[in-house]
Swiss-Prot record:
Family: Belongs to the multi antimicrobial extrusion (MATE) (TC 2.A.66.1) family. MdtK subfamily.
CDD domains: MATE_NorM_like
Gene Ontology MF annotations: antiporter activity; xenobiotic transmembrane transporter activity
Keyword check for 4Fe-4S: no
GO annotations of cellular component type: plasma membrane
Record-annotated membrane-spanning stretches: 11-31, 53-73, 93-113, 127-147, 160-180, 188-208, 243-263, 276-296, 314-334, 357-377, 387-407, 418-438
UniProt source species: Citrobacter koseri (strain ATCC BAA-895 / CDC 4225-83 / SGSC4696)
Name the UniProt record assigns to this protein: Multidrug resistance protein MdtK
Subcellular location, record wording: Cell inner membrane
Superkingdom, taxonomy of origin: Bacteria
Gene symbol of the encoding locus: mdtK
Length: 457
């Protein structure tokens, strides 16, 4: 029992800074929306539309680079720290290549926006302008993630937290300058949010790069040679590990976007209630997601040390802590669902529906915690392909069709409306949790030689 308590302490020490960093990142999006809304409703809507396209694109790149964390953790655990700098250099090359792709997609996103049904031309122009300003921040964001993944792979999660809040503090005044046109800058409205956020991402990267260069704990792996030429073998391996994670993130984000589109014809009350419950659930999701990042680090490090038993201990402890967190957040959600809904909207019908949906959200929080931590465990074992197949099957083959049938048809029961889609979420997330656990058990039952061979690739 003592080893599990010790492991839990180490996991929480890693996870808490990640949680706070994620809160800072979420707060940046909140600040953009509120400040754009203070300028005009049209600008706020433009930022919301632009963000709905930006997020899937940038999360694809973010997911691709998550492969660095278990690679660096494993090298650190095995004492091969001299190889880390080369992996990081290749991570920067990969980030640069993906940035070009993302920037191309975002530059041409106007075709998607203008094809939206009955969208106002002025709103479409502002959304396109916002994206074309924001896309210049894509390289800065992804370069920041490379440096952050280097730190987190070495079990240094506090720098990401500190620089995340630095970015938030810089974002507010820079937003104000570009939205309203102060200090000689043009008055850009919602487009100014894109300019400000792009600039902030570069500030965050420069700050993180400066920390990495000066940190005493990284002197032995400092990147003295600068940028070496691309190593196709290393980049190919990073893509093989990262692409399934990137696709899983992409399909997860697009799932919720598709459900939002399917709910939209049901009426304003249904849309508002669904959005409130979804937004609150997303905030609660920060906890298991951050714990999953910590579990990836610990499992990768233990495998690098050559101890499959300690890796199992880290995995089991992560799951135990995650379930305890989920039970607490579920009780919190059930107990305070109506006051929470009132914080978003005071319409009685909206509050009633949101409170009902939050009951369903409380049910799936345990499954959600297990599946996302299971994903973190599999990343630590470098078994990322299974993450994609499990996620795609659970969400798109089981969850979404089930939700559609329950919400919009009479095939099984009378039409349930938004609650049907939330039942679909429960089915999908529970299926994902079961499949993640089965895959984890399959991997852990393999011989130590096979597990360590895979981890060393």
């Amino acid at each position: 029992m003592q080893k599990y308590i010790s492991e839990a302490r180490q996991l929480l020490a890693l996870a808490i800074p990640v949680i706070l960093a994620q809160i800072a990142q979420t707060a940046m999006g909140f600040v953009d929306t509120v400040m754009a809304g203070g300028y005009s409703a049209t600008d706020m809507a433009a930022v919301a539309i632009g963000t709905s396209i930006w997020l899937p694109a940038i999360l694809f790149g973010h997911g691709l680079l998550l492969a660095l964390t278990p690679v660096i953790a494993q090298l650190n655990g095995s004492g091969r720290r001299e190889r880390i700098a080369h992996q990081v250099r290749q991570g920067f090359w990969l980030a640069g290549c993906v940035s070009v792709l993302i920037m191309f997609v975002l530059w041409n996103a106007g075709y998607i926006i203008r094809s939206m049904h009955n969208i106002d031309p002025a709103l479409a122009d502002k959304a396109v302008g916002y994206l074309r300003a924001l896309l210049w921040g894509a390289p800065g964001y992804l370069f920041f993630q490379v440096a952050r993944n280097q730190c987190e792979g070495l079990a240094k999660t506090k720098p990401g937290m500190v620089i995340g809040f630095l970015g938030l503090l810089v974002n507010i005044p820079v937003n104000y300058i570009f939205i309203y046109g102060h200090f000689g800058m043009p008055e850009l409205g919602g487009v100014g949010c894109g300019v400000a956020t792009a600039a902030v991402y570069w500030v965050m990267f420069i700050a993180m790069a400066s920390y990495v260069k000066r940190a005493r704990s990284m002197r032995d792996i400092r990147n003295e040679r600068g940028f070496s030429k691309p190593d196709t073998a290393v980049m190919k391996r990073l893509v093989q590990l990262g692409l399934p994670i990137a696709l899983a993130l992409f399909f997860e984000v697009t799932l919720f976007a598709v459900v939002a589109l399917l709910v939209s014809p049901l009426g304003i009350v249904d849309v508002a209630g669904h959005q409130i419950a979804l937004n609150f659930s997303s905030l609660m999701f920060v906890l298991p997601m951050s714990l999953a990042a910590a579990v990836t680090i610990r499992v990768g490090y233990r495998l690098g040390q050559g101890s499959t038993l300690d890796a199992q201990t880290a995995a089991r402890t992560g799951l135990g802590v995650g379930v305890c967190m989920a039970v607490i957040t579920a009780i919190f959600t059930v107990t305070l669902r109506e006051p929470i809904a009132l914080l978003y909207n005071d319409n009685p019908e909206v509050v009633t529906l949101a409170a009902q949906l939050m009951l369903l959200a409380a049910v799936y929080q345990i499954s959600d915690s297990i599946q996302v931590i299971g994903s973190g465990i599999l990343r630590g074992y470098k078994d990322t392909r299974s993450i994609f197949f499990i996620t795609f099957t659970a969400y798109w083959v089981l969850g979404l069709p089930s939700g559609y049938i329950l919400a919009l048809t009479d095939l099984v029961v009378d039409r349930m409306g938004p609650a049907g889609f939330w039942m679909g979420f429960i089915i999908g997330l529970t299926s994902a949790a079961i499949m993640m656990m089965l895959r984890m058990r399959y991997l852990q039952r393999q011989s130590s030689a096979i597990i360590l061979q895979r981890a060393a690739r």
